């Protein structure tokens, strides 16, 4: 009876950990719709996706025109965002949004920009601001209640950036992606990827051990019945 009670409690705990849906490919619009429940990559939860007010004069990129592809696992969660935008002289388009990452102890963040081009003084950029162990103020950039940091990419000049983060089991992330035609040029883009390095929390390791114990006990019990 004790064994059955233990297994029941363990199964309940596993069910609670896995209650959020697994992150799948979609659009920024579909990720916004996830709300506070979010989705999971391994044991990490990504949630509370929200768009923010952009630069004066910029045209917002439609959220259903930004595609999201999750990757990695518990120790290497990542999100790749892609869109196809082309602008000419005097035009600027922007996608600025924030989200939260929690679960494992996050130790570093990296940003990569690709599939972009520019002519004359056009530019494609992505700035990633992060708040380790806290949240941003209403603008998604300032007022970090934890430890703030930022990553910068400018196509053709610096296409990747990385920084230590935390360690923290919770972080707020804001991306500000722009395609700017400049005053005499043009630009097109692009793909930008947020990647993180994380260490499983003791609770995650405990749940993994519980899962192994359940499977082992079930096999032993089946053999004894046979």
Question: Each predicted region: which residue ranges?
Answer:
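N-terminal signal peptide c-region/cleavage motif recognized by signal peptidases
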Residues: 15-17
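Single, functionally critical "micro-switch" positions that shape active/binding sites
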Residues: 200, 226
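Positively charged n-region of N-terminal signal peptides that target proteins for export
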Residues: 1-4, 223-225
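Sec-dependent N-terminal signal peptides
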Residues: 4-13, 208-211
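Helix-boundary and membrane-interface capping/anchor signal
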Residues: 21-198
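A short, hydrophobic C-terminal helix/tail in secreted or cell-surface proteins
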Residues: 201-219
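A detector of low-complexity, intrinsically disordered, Ser/Thr/Gly/Pro/Ala-rich segments
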Residues: 2, 20-22, 215
């Amino acid at each position: 009876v004790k064994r059955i009670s233990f297994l029941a409690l363990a199964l309940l705990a596993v069910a609670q950990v896995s209650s959020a849906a697994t992150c799948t490919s979609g659009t920024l619009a579909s990720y916004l719709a996830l709300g506070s429940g979010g989705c999971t990559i391994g044991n990490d939860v990504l949630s509370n996706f929200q768009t923010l007010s952009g630069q004066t004069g910029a045209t917002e990129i439609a959220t259903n025109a930004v595609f999201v592809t999750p990757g990695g696992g518990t120790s290497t969660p990542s999100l790749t965002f892609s869109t196809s935008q082309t602008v000419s002289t005097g035009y600027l388009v922007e996608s600025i949004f924030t989200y939260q990452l929690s679960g494992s102890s996050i130790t570093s963040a990296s940003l990569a920009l690709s599939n972009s081009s520019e002519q004359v003084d056009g530019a494609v950029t992505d700035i990633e601001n992060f708040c380790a162990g806290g949240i941003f103020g209403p603008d998604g950039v300032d007022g970090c209640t934890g430890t703030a940091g930022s990553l910068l990419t400018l196509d053709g000049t610096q296409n990747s950036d990385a920084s230590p983060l935390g360690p923290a089991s919770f972080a707020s992330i804001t991306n500000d992606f722009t395609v700017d035609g400049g005053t005499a040029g043009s630009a097109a883009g692009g793909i930008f990827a947020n990647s993180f390095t994380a260490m499983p929390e003791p609770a995650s390791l405990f749940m993994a051990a519980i899962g192994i114990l359940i499977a082992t006990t079930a096999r032993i019990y089946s053999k004894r019945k046979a």
